[in-house]
């Protein structure tokens, strides 16, 4: 076992210890198929939670998307995301001739699964912000890859935006039934439907808390 493998097991254990990192599969089983998991985004811990909630045998082929400027700023963060999580780095500062999806396209061509957050940025408002177009373009280019919606619950209370120390809170990740890009479906309709598939997985308790004054 390599040091990176050992660190991965340790981090999965810590994530489950602090948050529970319980994965609930509704509409799809945890199978070794190429997938794009797309979820709501509220914390830097989001992709760690999804990764920890996956069965061990799926983690090696499932790569999170990570902001290059943040996750390569520092030797440990860079090593962690590169060696342990095998992250796909994306640049938030882009040139006009740069395709922001190219790293994701390359990973999918190599047979990897991905964890992405179509909002593009974190939100602490409960419901996801409008989805950006990346998911639509990936669905167009890779119709054979399953698109799995996921709802991460309670993680904003573990590590809210701006905080650096996690608080022990039970979290869940609910994986829903796969969606597909319909024949002739336009970008706007697909993104609205994809967002609705994520929101539909929100537990009733969380909906009531969000609606409370």
Model features per residue range: what roles?
Residues 3-5, 10-41:
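Helix-to-loop junction immediately C-terminal to a conserved catalytic motif
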